[in-house]
Every structure is written in structure tokens, then in C-alpha cells.
């Protein structure tokens, strides 16, 4: 049910004009190769090539750019230092890290995603841009292109005028979902909840499977609460963080004795996020009812919207990350605009509200 909800923004239509790309790499050879590769694809238009993070900031201050291809190891400002500033004042410009340091599953790659990168791609040496790599890169960039194109005319929404629902007074379980920019927000929420071991916590973050063990390790460093990668039929434990694996959606079911168990699903959702937030939220609503608390954090698209509807329909409640603290306000924004949120807050205050309402209902 949750998987049949809404298409993500990444699959929405665009106006057909090419995406304006800035290439940032200290290697002249790489800049030329990437410029040629992108220049031959009608979906993209290379508007500039620069050799450093400092030059990139100067460029975007003067010229509109939809998508930035960014190296990490550069003089003056490296890619990780400049990344948050390149996202733009409304945090809607797409930045893709393309670096030899960004092998899939590496801690550097996870750090880049935590800072708001739309994607990370491991870069081969300049002389080894094979046709297979070029096709892979263009496919990854094309997936982000519709969202980058919409950054030209960002939708205006007065967050202060949003209709908010009353917060719940019963907290039996908390489920947290995020995507682009969500990792740092998740860590902040978890740090605020670590002194309360009374309820189980479920987390779905849009990440490939190879990154999930690294995220689990980051969570363990952030809290003394136990952190487990969810497995099929695993009993749900209070005071434990259950992290969705990258290979399946995190859902819930009941065992023969009525205990709540982890259920993993590989059913594809229409919005194609994997793992997706909607199945987790929907399962939370089904098994915890008015004690279900959903938290939707920074991310592109609308994953979590259908699940938030399920939580509210079961008399549970949902908290959305506020616009100002979000790298991308797509997922939380869709919940707020849908009138489903009980509060819009920065991550640290989300944890405070959950504990406040839990104590009120204890």
C-alpha cells in the first residue's frame, strides 16, 4: 500500500532545456574530458570549468548553475569544505562528488552525502574514462537532472502559515526517515534521544547497501543506545535503533506470540527510493497506532508522504524538519504542505519535543 503512493520529484517532467553544469577539478585533463563527455549529451550544457573550490564559489556567485561536478582533493578549499556553500542559498542546487577518494562505501563518500551531496561517484584516472564509466556517470547525473532543473524556479511556500496538527501525547515507537542531507540530521536527533531507552527507534536513510554499515557505525559513535542493521524476523527491542539495510525496505510484522518483528521487503515503490520511508511509516502506523511518532528529515522527493498519511490516519503524529535546517526540503516539505505535520523543527528540537511528549504520556 505504501509503495503505491506518489512518484518522487526525480521522476517529474521537466521543460526539456539542458541542465547547466559547472565542472570543478584541479586536473586540466579531467576538466577537458568531462567537458567533452557532457558536451556531447544534449541533456547537459557545460557553462564553466574551474580548478578549485574558491574559483567555484566565485563562479556560482555570478552565474546560474544547476548541477556541480565536484572533485575532493583540490588546492585552497577542498571539495568537502566547499560543498555546503555550493548548494546555494535555497539549498536546491545539485552537487555530485566525482573523486578517486569517493569509492562506494567509503567514509569520505558517506561524509559527502551527510553534507548534502546529491550523489558520489568514484572517478577513474583521466586516461581511463571507459565507455562503461561514461554511461554510468551520465545515467547518475540524469537521475538528478529534473531536481536540478527545478532549482531555477523553486516553489515558494510560507512555512509559517502551514496548518499544524496537535502533537501526540503517546510515544510507543519512533521512526525516522531521510535522504539528501538527512544523515547529519539523523545523528542530531539520535543524540537528543540517547538518554531515553523506553521505546524502539527505526531509521530509513536513502543509501546504497554498501554505506549502511558505515552509517550504523556513525550512529554507534553518536549514542550509547544499541544500533542494529535490521534483519528478517528480528524481534523489535525497546531502546534499540533498528537501521534499514540498503537491500530492503524496513517493515514490521507479528510473531506467533504476538511480539513485533522486523519484516524486510524488496517490493519496488513507485518513487523508486530504496530503502523507502513509506513502508516503514505505514508499518509503524499499523502496529503502534496512536503511539506512532514519525520523523521526516531532509531529502528530495515525496517519500514518506504516504506513510505520514497512514500514521496520522492511525491517530499517530509526525514531525517534519524545518526548511531552514534542511539541505533539501522536498520530503519534509511535502508532509508539511499536506497538513500532516504536528511541528516543523530543527533536528535537535525534534528530539526535545519527542521526549517532552513521551514524558507527558508516561
Regions found by a protein language model. Give the residues of each.
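Conserved acid/base catalytic micro-environments in cytosolic active-site loops
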Residues: 2-23, 27-43, 49, 54-69, ...
Amino acid at each position: 500500500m505504501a509503495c503505491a503512493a506518489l512518484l518522487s520529484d526525480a521522476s517529474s517532467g521537466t521543460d526539456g532545456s539542458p541542465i547547466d553544469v559547472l565542472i570543478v577539478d584541479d586536473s586540466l585533463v579531467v576538466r577537458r574530458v568531462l567537458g567533452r563527455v557532457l558536451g556531447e549529451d544534449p541533456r547537459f550544457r557545460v557553462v564553466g570549468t574551474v580548478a578549485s573550490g574558491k574559483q567555484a564559489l566565485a563562479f556560482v556567485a555570478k552565474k546560474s548553475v544547476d548541477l556541480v561536478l565536484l572533485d575532493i582533493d583540490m588546492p585552497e578549499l577542498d571539495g568537502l569544505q566547499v560543498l555546503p556553500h555550493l548548494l546555494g542559498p535555497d539549498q536546491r542546487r545539485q552537487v555530485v562528488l566525482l573523486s578517486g577518494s569517493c569509492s562506494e562505501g567509503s567514509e569520505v563518500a558517506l561524509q559527502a552525502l551527510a553534507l548534502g551531496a546529491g550523489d558520489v561517484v568514484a572517478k577513474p584516472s583521466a586516461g581511463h574514462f571507459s565507455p562503461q564509466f561514461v554511461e554510468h556517470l551520465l545515467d547518475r547525473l540524469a537521475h538528478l537532472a529534473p531536481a536540478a532543473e527545478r532549482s531555477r524556479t523553486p516553489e515558494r511556500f510560507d512555512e509559517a502559515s502551514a496548518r499544524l496538527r496537535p502533537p501526540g501525547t503517546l510515544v510507543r515507537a519512533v521512526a525516522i526517515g531521510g535522504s539528501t542531507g538527512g544523515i547529519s540530521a539523523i545523528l542530531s536527533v539520535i543524540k537528543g534521544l540517547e538518554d531515553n531507552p523506553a521505546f524502539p527507534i527505526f531509521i530509513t536513510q536513502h543509501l546504497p547497501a554498501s554505506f549502511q554499515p558505515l552509517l550504523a557505525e556513525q550512529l554507534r559513535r553518536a549514542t550509547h543506545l544499541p544500533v542494529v542493521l535490521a534483519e528478517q524476523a528480528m524481534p523489535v527491542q525497546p531502546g534499540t535503533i533498528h537501521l534499514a539495510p540498503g537491500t530492503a525496505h524496513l517493515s514490521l510484522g507479528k510473531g506467533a506470540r504476538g511480539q513485533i518483528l522486523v519484516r524486510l521487503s524488496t517490493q519496488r515503490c513507485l518513487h523508486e527510493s530504496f530503502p523507502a520511508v513509506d513502508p516503514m511509516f505505514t508499518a509503524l502506523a499499523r502496529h503502534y497506532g496512536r503511539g506512532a511518532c514519525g520523523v521526516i528529515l531532509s531529502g528530495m522527493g515525496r517519500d514518506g508522504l504516504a506513510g505520514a498519511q497512514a500514521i496520522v490516519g492511525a491517530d499517530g503524529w509526525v514531525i517534519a524538519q524545518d526548511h531552514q535546517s534542511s539541505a533539501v526540503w522536498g520530503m519534509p516539505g511535502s508532509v508539511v504542505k499536506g497538513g500532516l505535520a504536528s511541528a516543523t523543527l530543527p533536528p535537535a528540537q525534534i528530539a526535545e519535543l519527542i521526549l517532552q511528549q513521551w514524558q507527558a504520556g508516561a
